[in-house]
Amino acid sequence: METTTTKKPYEVVVLMHPDASLEEQKDLFKKNKATIESYKGSINSLETWGKRTLATPIGKLKKAIYFHSTFEADTQAIAELERTMRINDKVLRFMHTRLDERTSLGKFMEGFKKGLAESAAREKEREAKAAARKAAFAAAKAERSERYDKGE
């Protein structure tokens, strides 16, 4: 009986130890690329999001290096990728997510980047409003302080 394996689209987010060297980071993704290609898969994109603060600490670590990748592979490749990432001490967390097969990876990445840009714009807007509130509060406090000094 012949089994056919079909490539399915996936994305993965990997959190690496903040002290991981550039060489260790490259080695991990070279191994991942080799694993995917050995199962006749292909990598669509790999992005480094850099060192970011974690929402909740992992052990005593408050920061991690984030990576995001999209690729096509079969389920056996995913099992092997997860096995190798569990072994690697520098990988703190990872999550593979199977994407909708009806959407091409290119379209997915366009939508993903658009969502990131919108999220960043909302965050900037929130920060600007917070800064304006802080400035208004400081001005009101200074005014009250002046009136108090004058004895009003």
Curated annotation (Swiss-Prot):
<dbReference type="GO" id="GO:0070181">
    <property type="term" value="F:small ribosomal subunit rRNA binding"/>
</dbReference>
<dbReference type="InterPro" id="IPR000529">
    <property type="entry name" value="Ribosomal_bS6"/>
</dbReference>
<dbReference type="GO" id="GO:0006412">
    <property type="term" value="P:translation"/>
</dbReference>
<dbReference type="GO" id="GO:1990904">
    <property type="term" value="C:ribonucleoprotein complex"/>
</dbReference>
<dbReference type="GO" id="GO:0005737">
    <property type="term" value="C:cytoplasm"/>
</dbReference>
<dbReference type="GO" id="GO:0003735">
    <property type="term" value="F:structural constituent of ribosome"/>
</dbReference>
<dbReference type="InterPro" id="IPR035980">
    <property type="entry name" value="Ribosomal_bS6_sf"/>
</dbReference>
<comment type="similarity">
    <text>Belongs to the bacterial ribosomal protein bS6 family.</text>
</comment>
<protein>
    <recommendedName>
        <fullName>Small ribosomal subunit protein bS6</fullName>
    </recommendedName>
</protein>
<keyword id="KW-0689">Ribosomal protein</keyword>
<keyword id="KW-0699">rRNA-binding</keyword>
<keyword id="KW-0687">Ribonucleoprotein</keyword>
<dbReference type="Pfam" id="PF01250">
    <property type="entry name" value="Ribosomal_S6"/>
</dbReference>
<keyword id="KW-0694">RNA-binding</keyword>
<dbReference type="GO" id="GO:0005840">
    <property type="term" value="C:ribosome"/>
</dbReference>
<dbReference type="InterPro" id="IPR014717">
    <property type="entry name" value="Transl_elong_EF1B/ribsomal_bS6"/>
</dbReference>
<comment type="function">
    <text>Binds together with bS18 to 16S ribosomal RNA.</text>
</comment>
<dbReference type="InterPro" id="IPR020814">
    <property type="entry name" value="Ribosomal_S6_plastid/chlpt"/>
</dbReference>
